[in-house]
């Protein structure tokens, strides 16, 4: 039987970029990685009402640059920038280096997989029927330009005795195509019956690099010439 690979990890270095971008030797790698995980968890908990999609961390020359992608930048910044200044200080204390925070606004939250998954999870926690929540999310994503979307929920749906998986798809979601821009997100709904997992795949089109088109073929030719 085939197993599904993570859509983002599958495309790293092709159409997706890493969430943490820094270099460290073997003695510091574990410490940096653990710090990144702690900072992400802290920011998500601190800004749980700000619709945060993803957090990118860079470490240039004894500094840190944290980029927060959010649909509600006003909540992150706060009145006269007070909240973001406080957040910067707290993150710097955890990372042990000066921190600069960038805020990137998400213009279309209906087409962001992480925010869509969290929205569905929130509706399930408020006892909305899962089929209604799924169809609403699919319709909203297509309305703002998504070429395809698949949503899946797993668990004790509507309080049933036996856990099951239900999914709904509209349009194309080509998971095997590396050049396909697939946005994948996951969230959990904590209901009185247990945890329900929510997965969302959104296809936004194909990324075609016209400048390097044919480059792999050229590399094969050069390698063959070198061997021959």
Swiss-Prot record:
GO CC, one annotated term: cytosolic small ribosomal subunit
Keyword RNA-binding: yes
GO biological process terms, semicolon-separated: translation
Keyword Transferase: no
Role this protein plays: Binds the lower part of the 30S subunit head. Binds mRNA in the 70S ribosome, positioning it for translation.
Taxonomic path: Bacteria, Pseudomonadati, Pseudomonadota, Gammaproteobacteria, Chromatiales
Protein name: Small ribosomal subunit protein uS3
Family affiliation: Belongs to the universal ribosomal protein uS3 family.
Molecular function GO labels: mRNA binding; rRNA binding; structural constituent of ribosome
Protein keywords: Ribonucleoprotein, Ribosomal protein, RNA-binding, rRNA-binding
SMART domains: KH
CDD domains, alphabetized: KH-II_30S_S3 (cd02412)
Family annotation (PROSITE patterns): KH_TYPE_2 (PS50823), RIBOSOMAL_S3 (PS00548)
Classification via InterPro entries: KH_dom (IPR004087), KH_dom-like_a/b (IPR015946), KH_dom_type_2 (IPR004044), KH_sf_prok-type (IPR009019), Ribosomal_S3_C_sf (IPR036419), Ribosomal_uS3_bac-typ (IPR005704), Ribosomal_uS3_C (IPR001351), Ribosomal_uS3_CS (IPR018280)
Any coiled-coil regions, as ranges: none
Pfam family, one: KH_2
Top-level taxon of origin: Bacteria
Subunit structure and binding partners: Part of the 30S ribosomal subunit. Forms a tight complex with proteins S10 and S14.
Organism for this UniProt entry: Halorhodospira halophila (strain DSM 244 / SL1) (Ectothiorhodospira halophila (strain DSM 244 / SL1))
Domain KH type-2 stretches: 39-107
């Amino acid at each position: 039987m085939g197993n599904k690979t993570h859509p983002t990890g599958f495309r790293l270095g092709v159409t997706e970029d890493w969430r943490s971008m820094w270099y460290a030797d073997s003695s510091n790698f574990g410490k940096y990685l653990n710090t990144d995980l702690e900072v992400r968890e802290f920011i998500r908990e601190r800004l749980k009402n700000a619709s945060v999609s993803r957090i990118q961390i860079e470490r240039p020359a004894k500094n840190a640059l944290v980029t927060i992608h959010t649909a509600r930048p006003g909540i992150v910044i706060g009145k006269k920038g007070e909240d973001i200044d406080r957040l910067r200080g707290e993150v710097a204390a955890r990372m042990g280096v000066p921190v600069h925070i960038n805020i990137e606004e998400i213009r279309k939250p209906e087409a962001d997989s992480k925010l869509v998954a969290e929205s569905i999870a929130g509706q399930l926690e408020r006892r909305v029927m899962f089929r209604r929540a799924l169809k609403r999310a699919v319709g909203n994503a297509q309305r703002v330009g998504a070429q395809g979307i698949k949503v899946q929920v797993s668990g004790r749906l509507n309080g049933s005795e036996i856990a099951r998986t239900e999914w709904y798809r509209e349009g194309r979601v080509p998971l095997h195509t590396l050049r396909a821009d697939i946005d994948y997100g996951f969230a959990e709904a904590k209901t009185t019956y247990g945890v329900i997992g929510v997965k969302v795949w959104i296809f936004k089109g194909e990324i075609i690099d016209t400048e390097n088109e044919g480059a792999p073929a050229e590399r094969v030719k050069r390698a063959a010439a070198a061997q021959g």
